[in-house]
Amino acid sequence: MNQQKSTFIFILTLGILSMLPPFGVDMYLPSFLEIAKDLDVSPEQVQHTLTSFAYGMAFGQLFWGPFGDSFGRKPIILLGVIVGALTALVLTEINSVGNFTALRFVQGFFGAAPVVLSGALLRDLFSKDQLSKVMSTITLVFMLAPLVAPIIGGYIVKFFHWHAIFYVISLVGLLAAALVFFIIPETHKKENRIPLRLNIIARNFLLLWKQKEVLGYMFAASFSFGGLFAFVTAGSIVYIGIYGVPVDQFGYFFMMNIVTMIFASFLNSRFVTKVGAETMLRIALAIQFLSGMWLILTALLDLGFWPMAIGVAFFVGPNPVISSNAMASALERCPQMAGTANSLIGSVRFAVGAIMGSLVASMKMDTAAPMLFTMGACVVISVLAYYFLTSRNLKSRG
């Protein structure tokens, strides 16, 4: 019983760690207009603070993986969580959007450490079958963050100052750091640690870039995520600023998208062993493609809020299915470099998301069209990358 209890607390701690990035992103979405007013800038400039966080996550995923292999998992995870929490506190004292954007990059960069190294820590401890079960549990905990964070953020903005959002983010981060310190063991033994050799790291990344199929899956997942991040970047301005959704109600509309993601993930877990990752990936891409075309149509015909909101939910829903199955298919083709591939794909995924978010943020948001066209374009690129870069062996993989 004690062993079961300690395992539960261990998994719960990792689940809380996995919640930190979505808390850092989703909780302050309802506050964009308030931040813009407070800093005397346009809402579009505030959007760049979100894409800056994503750029930090992209670079951090390349950086922290090798450091964790060299210096151990626990100290790097602690460093990332503590710096992220302290950065959230500093953000409450910032009165310049430029400094705010720079600090969000720092927060994303250090926030990547627990994301990358939690997975490595799990691989140190669990067998393949156990790992799958543990990851399913952690995913359920992770899904709570984007489900509740925008709702919490909306009520905080309604009743308090937007600074309070970052106090909460900092408090959650410090709580996570305490849990890591007292509960998480160091799993990467000193005799297994790998010295930092940049030439070997660079060589492995280059080898992956030369594998056509790996690129196909990577870009399929990355541009699917890019479409999602275009919505995350601009969604609050579109819903609140353009369609007049009350700030404290935005989280409930955002929740609709998370529910479709959870439902899609559930269906994937039920059927992927029966029909295969490749089939589930194709189905998810097809649903997202049709949803993307519908969103473009709603923009062209100005169909209003609900047709757009429902289309967004169906667009966002397949994203975890695309991501998980594309990742599994890519790693299957480079098992000897699975860690490097995981780091590279995660980095490219956030980089594409940041670029798409920056693209949307650079456009004038008088209507929802810039966001919707960007989402539609992303899924087109995703489908084309999958079709042209992985098509040679589709028949043999069935």
From Swiss-Prot:
Belongs to the major facilitator superfamily. Bcr/CmlA family. It comes from Haemophilus influenzae (strain ATCC 51907 / DSM 11121 / KW20 / Rd). Keywords: Antibiotic resistance, Cell inner membrane, Cell membrane, Membrane, Transmembrane, Transmembrane helix, Transport. It is found in: Cell inner membrane. GO terms for cellular component: plasma membrane. CDD domains: MFS_MdfA_MDR_like (cd17320). Its main location: membrane. Coiled coil: none annotated. It is a multi-pass membrane protein. GO terms for biological process: response to antibiotic; xenobiotic detoxification by transmembrane export across the plasma membrane. One of its GO terms (molecular function) is xenobiotic transmembrane transporter activity. Involved in sulfonamide (sulfathiazole) and bicyclomycin resistance. Probable membrane translocase. This is Bicyclomycin resistance protein homolog. SUPFAM superfamilies: MFS general substrate transporter (SSF103473). The chain crosses the membrane at residues 8-28, 52-72, 75-95, 102-122, 137-157, 164-184, 225-245, 247-267, 275-295, 296-316, 343-363, 369-389.
